[in-house]
Amino acid sequence: MQLVGREANRFHFLSDSDRLTEDDKKIYHAMISLSDGMYSMNEEVLISSLKILSELLYKHYGKKTILLIDEYDVPLDKAFQNGYYKEMTTLIRGMFGEALKTNDSLQFAVLTGCLRVSKVKYFYRT
């Protein structure tokens, strides 16, 4: 959540965009709102965050977005090693499903991984 909030905050100019509706701005502010110095978006906003950002950037610039996700597999590996793999796969499946499958604001996306598939046990779990 903190990483998503920090990345969303990089686009703070969206708060003042004359191309976004007040509802768009409320959704954006839900992504960057802080509570006790921590980003505090709810789970629904977190899961939709990549799609929301791409939609808002599309509305602002009038051009479809390009989504670059580097080392997507690192959070999965950490989750596997620390016992919260099921929760992480649910989150990533939701985020990527929203951002990549049902996103008319997306031109294309590139995902890279850094772990060797042959050495990653959780790719072979049933």
Question: Each predicted region: which residue ranges?
Answer:
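Phosphate-binding site recognition
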Residues: M1-T126
